[in-house]
Amino acid sequence: MVVKTVVVRFVIGAAIVGAIVALGAVWYVRGPGPLAFAGGKSVALADYRDGDPTGVSATMRQASLLERGKYLTEAADCAVCHTAPGGKEYAGGFAFKLPFGTMYSTNITPDYETGIGKYTDQEFLDAMHRGIRRDGARLYPAMPYTSYTYISDADALAIKAYLFSLKPVRAVLPENTLLFPFNQRWAMMFWSLVFNPDTRFQPDSSQSLKWNRGAYLAEALAHCGECHTPRNIGFALNNRKKFAGAPVAGWRAFNISSDKATGLGSWTDEDIAFYLSLGHASGHGTASGAMGEAVDHSFSKMAPDDIEAMVTFLRSVPPSTTPDFSVKSAPAPVSHRDGVTASVLGKKIFEGACASCHGWTGESAVSPLATLTGSAGVNDPSASNVALVVIGGTRRLTPDGALSMPSFGHAYSDDEIAAVSNYVTARFGARASSLTARDVAKLREQVAD
């Protein structure tokens, strides 16, 4: 009897210790919330006395429901992910290519059969905040519901009202092709239990209305962390390295913390505002890839006071260093001085296809948007962004019209693209890259339509 009692106590004790360890592990992996760094006190929206940081820009407070919904839909950048290349806007079909398969974005037009036309208000909120579809199935976090969960109910329903005002598009989309066990949607219930806070935005009472507005825009609507914050072991955002930069579908989303060496710390407020609004900041480069799309479809359509609020918030994010990257460029080369790892092939391609626009010094005479010196991509020793721009080209919308760089993906081989990319980083960047043909082939796979 004594032995039995001891065994029972041992089992109970072990279970308690195990539970504590498990809870501790979950707490550690989950990490801090997105605004924990501010160290202030979160309060209910109704209890924040300085105003309402949610909703639309202060300049649009008298706008109609549909006008507010359109503004918020654009701020949330919905069109980029829910529009396939060459497809109808919001009709879905955009492919997310992952190491374990491909998934496709959904049709969010109000079509009754293939879209969201049957969604009630509560079902729409469940999808936005909890990642749960109308049929009860779990959404994958390619839909950034762990960020959208902070969007207020009123704003989410304004987005729904705008989407439901659009013309329904019948679009039968491809089936996801995810490998086991990633194709088991039910398992996302446990992932969400750990990593989705399922809570609406709560202002920080120690911060200004402008800061809180910027936080709401950056964390909830614009979901900046989804690209710019590294992932943890559970593929959720690792806010211990908030905004430190991360790889996204082959591209490198750069450090946007306040770090002076590798982030935005050396940028002026005007630099950041210009980059968000126009996709370019003098001495810092031009937005391409997903960031370019975010500028075109979202940030460029935001009111100036909202851009200013985001700048205020970004300034407050603690510095997080990216060891292999520097925002500091090499001095502009003189004459035809080559980079330290320049190849004959790389120089030949640059001379034939690049120099006429970008210049031998990296200071473009055609447009400041084509200047290479200072560009984050050129200073990235992985050279992935440089290679992807060469492969796919890029296009920027400016107040004076569109400015394009053509795609060279079909004109040059993987070896040639690697050579010219390495030449560019060696000649104009802080550190030479060593991209290989195999690296370029992998990049092609990740961005292929």
Predicted regions and their residues:
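Signal peptide-directed extracytoplasmic domains
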Residues: 88-102, 110-111, 121, 127, ...
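Solvent-exposed, acidic/flexible segments
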Residues: 58-66, 71, 101, 117-121, ...
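Axial heme c-ligation environment in periplasmic c-type cytochrome domains
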Residues: 104-118, 129-154, 175-176, 253-264, ...
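Short loop/beta submotifs within extracellular cysteine-rich repeat domains
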Residues: 80, 89, 113-116, 126, ...
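C-type cytochrome heme c attachment motif
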Residues: 71-83, 106-107, 123-130, 141, ...
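Active-site substrate-binding loop specific to GH73 endo-beta-N-acetylglucosaminidase modules
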Residues: 90-101, 106-107, 229-280
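Sequence/structural segment immediately N-terminal to covalent heme-attachment motifs in c-type
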Residues: 61-84, 89-97, 190-193, 202-232, ...
